[in-house]
Amino acid sequence: LSQSKGGNESTHLPAWDDLYEQTGAACPYNNSHFLNRLEDVYRCINRSAVIKGSNGPLGVPAFEVRTPLSGHKVTTAPFGFYPTILGDQDHRRALDYLTDLAAGLGRRAYVEYKVIGALPEACLARHNINVTTPTLAHVLPLEDSYKVLKRGFAKRHRESLQTIDKRVRKDGVEIVATRVETDVRAWFRLLVRLYRDKHLMVTQPWPLFRRLCMDEDMSPLAELMIARKQGHVVAGVVVLKGRHEWVYAWSAQDPVAEKDGLVKYILDQSLQKAISFGAKRFSFGLTPPSHKGLRDFKMKWGCHEEPVYHLYWNARPKNVDLQMSARRLRMAYRFVPLWLAERLPSFIVPRLA
């Protein structure tokens, strides 16, 4: 993480961590500890920097990634994560910084810039930007009390949570936060199986979860909450925590326990915890346009929808629907043995970027 003046005038610019702390609305993906973990796990180069914006310091997330499939690029959202620009929301100067970086890497290097909401046409034209069809980000504004927040849930969703709560108490299901390796590994196996059998894709690699969910210095940022039944991990949710915003990052449950609704229950517990910590937003992540079931699930919590645009400089847009693209081909992934599916992400994901 570095500083850059971003203009001809010399100015004192804060460090990335200082700007992150000053920015009340910052997403936990912008936390330098998280960004550094991405650099470690995926062997990419973190070029994020604080530059001079038109109205103050501007933090631009940027990663230099070189892959066999994607080529050489500078991206603000590597490997499916979406840090935002910090401080001054000057997208023109952010794009100036990113395109200058890419231009210095060779004529075929390109920029991938992901942003919530549409940018002005003048900004797009200045950089000759290509834009993809937007995906949807789902964000739940948090109230000062869980009781008030719950009123915004769909009625049947509230009733379902009450039923699950009674079942959890009756069955003696234990809901705990954990950083124990055996728990984290057990949950990771559930996640790999879910992605293999239902989503037909690889998940993020084990080294990322080991660092996020087990390293003690990451405990203020990342938390795995699990459901343990009769001594076995049967469900779990990973949330990333920021001062202003929490992010629902991953979840998985044992298919046998799916009817118990434990992911939904743990997510509800996480919402209550976020409110108690003073968070103002809870992000439910991105939703492919074709995934109606996932969108409906998020809307039951009272989420608001925000369009996320993928902008490209020196490259054609890549309209990829994670739900439907190459689905017939991906069906074969179901036949991969679980032990192999656990190891494949470490080899595949860094090459997809």
Question: Which sequence ranges carry the predicted segments?
Answer:
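Aromatic (often tryptophan-rich) hydrophobic motifs at membrane interfaces
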Residues: V50, P57, G80, L95-A103, ...
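Active-site/acyl-donor-binding loops of N-acyltransferases
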Residues: V60, V65-T67, A122-L149, A279-A353
